[in-house]
């Protein structure tokens, strides 16, 4: 029995090491997924703040200032705000406006923002002068952008007739 004890201890230790390695991988996946969710929710809050500003200032065109976004959108991190931008463009028809928010995030962030807003089809990914919605069941046809947005950026595109 004495010669089996080291073998049994080795097998048990190997089992614990395998279990620990498996748990470490799961935690890493959950951390990455949590970051995507957090970015998706932050992008949704950013878009909502820009939209609130636009609704309160219906003749505005240009880039909504960061100070106004933080006033309407609550606590968004300075690191997040440094990555995102927006533009409000006149359509030239009556008082129409197109509000575009964008940032260099993955498609997963657009999907999370869409899911967090009840599958809002205004979230998607830019292809430069076009964009495609990330909403579940949305048409996959590329839609035109009124201004060029860097390709691969997550976007929220909303057209309003004020």
Regions found by a protein language model. Give the residues of each.
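Intrinsically disordered, low-complexity regions enriched in Pro/Ser/Thr/Gly and acidic residues
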Residues: 72-162
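Short, glycine/small-hydrophobic-rich surface segments
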Residues: 50-78
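Broad hydrophobic/π-residue packing in well-ordered secondary structure
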Residues: 4-5, 53-57, 87-89, 99
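Aliphatic-rich helix starts adjacent to a transmembrane/signal segment
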Residues: 12-41
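N-terminal signal-anchor/signal peptide hydrophobic helix marking the start
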Residues: 1-13
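Membrane-proximal N-terminal amphipathic helix
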Residues: 31-58
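Extracytoplasmic/secreted envelope proteins and their assembly/folding machinery
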Residues: 43, 47, 66, 110-112
């Amino acid at each position: 029995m004495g010669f089996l004890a080291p073998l049994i201890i080795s097998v048990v230790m190997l089992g614990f090491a395998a279990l620990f390695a498996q748990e470490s991988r799961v935690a890493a996946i959950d951390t990455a997924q949590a970051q995507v969710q957090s970015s998706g929710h932050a992008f949704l809050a950013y878009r909502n703040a820009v939209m609130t500003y636009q609704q309160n200032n219906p003749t505005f065109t240009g880039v909504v200032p960061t100070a106004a976004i933080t006033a309407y959108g609550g606590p968004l991190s300075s690191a997040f705000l440094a990555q995102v931008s927006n533009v409000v463009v006149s359509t030239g028809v009556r008082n129409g406006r197109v509000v575009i928010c964008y940032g260099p995030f993955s498609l997963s962030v657009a999907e999370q923002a869409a899911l967090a807003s009840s599958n809002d089809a205004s979230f998607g990914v830019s292809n430069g002068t076009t964009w495609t919605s990330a909403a579940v069941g949305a048409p996959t046809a590329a839609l035109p952008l009124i201004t060029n947005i860097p390709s691969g950026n997550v976007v929220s595109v909303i057209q309003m007739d004020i």
